[in-house]
């Protein structure tokens, strides 16, 4: 009963918080955020069809390879349509009465446009002509450096171990951490982009989680304009992914390509970085570990599935006496397909796993972490059961 009362209290607090947010529209402009996200979705949706025609004319087409899941040639370059949606939505945000204040006090959103143009351009070249890994990596470093140069960087880091608490990063540490995390997230999304709708869906889910977390930050910091950038960046990315997804879900009419997957990764990195920087311990207290760690946990949510897949792949290939980076058809999504899941079900299962971590981290700003943990545990059990159902059916058949 005590747990039920606590959960009811949390829900009441959340509901009253939402009402307060609508009442304080000047501090937390939910309607403007929704309009910006909708704009990104609409522009991306209609631009994707045009980009598909352009990709076919330029012969930027993904032909099926032995390790691929798709069986028909499919145009790439979807990232161009996504960037156009982002560009239009950010421009709209800069013209709206409340959100425009975020452009005055922060360069986060312009930084995303410039860095996004760099990484989308690199991706488009790769989608059409192909680039070696080193050149692509150099492009990723360049785009991440643009973010840092324009002021998007981790400035503080909360370490809950050994009584360290919050540490203020010096310039060198800030640059190195931001570059490392940005490039890691970019490659994580790129790595996981192996099934129709997977990268776009993961981008949508994680961006929504960051947006919810950012709205909570705005509430707790009395509408501080320093928290406008993560809210705008994440809602724009969510809208762009949502607009692209109808074209990309199984069976995909177009792939986002490296231009899209790297753009998604870059924007997720920028959103989590801008959310982490100005968090005040005065709003949460040093004991509220989960609220202070949530920006970093959101990064973990983005990288959880692809990094687990990458580590398992490296171990598997080394044990087999092959190069750690040699391609194969034993990735997590390949294995889920092999045990009997359909293409769509595999994508939905991975959505669930990432969503549990992402929304679990974001919800700590609204709910008691203990209650959040209990709900997450239940979700993990249910999703785990759904994941292994085909194996259980096989055993029953034997």
UniProtKB/Swiss-Prot annotation:
Cofactor annotation: Mg(2+); Mn(2+)
Subcellular location field: Cell membrane
Keywords noted in UniProt: Cell membrane, Cell wall biogenesis/degradation, Glycosyltransferase, Magnesium, Manganese, Membrane, Transferase, Transmembrane, Transmembrane helix
Family annotation (InterPro entries): Glycosyl_transferase_4
Pathway: Cell wall biogenesis; cell wall polysaccharide biosynthesis
UniProt record, GO biological process: capsule polysaccharide biosynthetic process; cell wall macromolecule biosynthetic process; cell wall organization; lipopolysaccharide biosynthetic process
Site (Important in orienting the substrate): 126-127
Bilayer-crossing regions: 33-53, 79-99, 105-125, 148-168, 175-195, 198-218, 225-245, 260-280, 295-315, 347-367, 372-392
Other comments on record: Mycobacteria use decaprenyl phosphate (C50-P) as a lipid carrier in all known cell wall biosynthetic pathways, rather than the usual undecaprenyl phosphate (C55-P) usually used in Gram-negative bacteria.
Role summary: Involved in the biosynthesis of the disaccharide D-N-acetylglucosamine-L-rhamnose which plays an important role in the mycobacterial cell wall as a linker connecting arabinogalactan and peptidoglycan via a phosphodiester linkage. Catalyzes the transfer of the N-acetylglucosamine-1-phosphate (GlcNAc-1P) moiety from UDP-GlcNAc onto the carrier lipid decaprenyl phosphate (C50-P), yielding GlcNAc-pyrophosphoryl-decaprenyl (GlcNAc-PP-C50).
Protein name: Decaprenyl-phosphate N-acetylglucosaminephosphotransferase
Organism of provenance: Mycobacterium leprae (strain TN)
């Amino acid at each position: 009963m005590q747990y039920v009362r606590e959960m009811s209290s949390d829900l009441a607090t959340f509901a009253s918080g939402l009402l307060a947010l609508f009442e304080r529209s000047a501090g937390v402009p939910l309607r403007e955020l929704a309009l910006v996200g909708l704009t990104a979705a609409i522009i991306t949706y209609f631009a994707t069809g045009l980009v598909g025609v352009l990709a076919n004319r330029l012969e930027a087409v993904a032909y099926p390879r032995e390790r691929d899941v798709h069986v028909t040639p499919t145009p790439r370059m979807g990232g161009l349509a996504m960037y156009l949606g982002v560009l239009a939505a950010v421009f709209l945000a800069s013209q709206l009465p409340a959100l425009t204040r975020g452009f005055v006090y922060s360069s986060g959103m312009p930084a995303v446009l410039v860095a996004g143009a760099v990484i989308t351009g690199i991706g488009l070249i790769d989608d059409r002509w192909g680039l070696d890994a080193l050149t692509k990596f150099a492009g990723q470093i360049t785009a991440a450096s643009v973010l840092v140069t324009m002021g998007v960087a981790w400035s503080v880091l909360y370490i809950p171990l050994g009584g360290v608490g919050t540490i203020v990063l010096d310039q060198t540490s800030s640059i190195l951490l931001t570059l490392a995390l940005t490039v890691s997230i970019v490659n994580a999304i790129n790595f996981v982009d192996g099934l129709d709708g997977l990268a776009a869906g993961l981008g949508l889910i994680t961006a929504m989680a960051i947006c919810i977390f950012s709205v909570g930050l705005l509430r707790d910091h009395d509408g501080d304009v320093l928290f406008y950038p993560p809210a705008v960046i994440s809602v724009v990315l969510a809208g762009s992914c949502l607009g692209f997804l109808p074209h990309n879900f199984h069976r995909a009419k177009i792939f986002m390509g490296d231009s899209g997957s790297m753009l998604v990764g870059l924007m997720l990195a920028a959103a989590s970085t801008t959310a982490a920087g100005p968090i005040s311990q005065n709003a949460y207290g040093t004991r509220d570990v989960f609220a202070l760690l949530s920006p970093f946990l959101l990064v973990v949510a983005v990288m959880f599935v692809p990094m687990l897949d990458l580590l398992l792949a490296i171990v598997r290939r080394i044990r087999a006496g092959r190069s750690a980076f040699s391609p194969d058809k034993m990735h997590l999504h390949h294995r889920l397909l092999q045990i009997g899941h359909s293409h769509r079900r595999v994508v939905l299962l991975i959505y669930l796993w990432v969503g549990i971590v992402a929304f679990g981290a974001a919800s700590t700003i609204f709910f008691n972490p203990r209650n959040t943990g209990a709900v997450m545990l239940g979700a993990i059990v249910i999703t785990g059961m759904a994941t292994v159902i085909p194996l259980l059916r096989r055993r029953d058949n034997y």
